[in-house]
Amino acid sequence: MKKFFQKVRSVPLYGWVAGVFFLAFEYGLYLLGNWLAHVTGTLSWAFAPKVPFIDDKIPFIGFFVIFYIYSYIFWICGPAAVSLTGKDNFKKFCKAMTASYLMGFVFFVFMPTYIDRVAENVYFYANRPGVIGWMLRFAYDNDGGNIGYNLFPSYHCLISACCYLGVRKRPEISKAFKVYSFVMTVLICMSTVFIKQHYFLDIIGGLAVPAICFAIFYKN
């Protein structure tokens, strides 16, 4: 535990600033994508990227909303951890992450997607009493209410994958933290479909985009 707090204290200020900035940047792009899709009329093209024989088989598991909401903390800590790997790698990480965000944003504007939560009957679970029900309502109501847009690629999957890829091969990062980052990325991806915030294809897109961007910026 002592080593953990020493590591936290050793994070450069710019690491924490970057974590908060990217969190705000994500939310800003999400809102801007929605707005531009409305203004340009591309929202009329919106479709549900549902693959029934896959998505209808995925069960609803409410407690996964914990991982879904915890992701915001994970996303702040991700850039902070990468800042411990040196400025050169940190710059590459920021470029790759920014490119991933912007690529996702292009999809939001020109290939808008949606989920009808009424049709999917998810509010049945959100209206149950208790902490899990409250967390589900919080997640849904802050993401469009009855209709959620900007599904593909899943930003939850995209950003979590970025945080993992940033530390995956770095010798400065402990094996334990790498395992933690990988496990959290998997759990967050699972949460998006288990609480019916996304469809399966959104996960594929959310993982493919950062894989491409990191391959480009880390090719040397």
How would you name each of these model-derived features?
Residues 52, 74-78, 158-166, 183-191:
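Hydrophobic, membrane-inserted alpha-helices
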Residues 33-49, 53, 84-176:
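Membrane-interface loops
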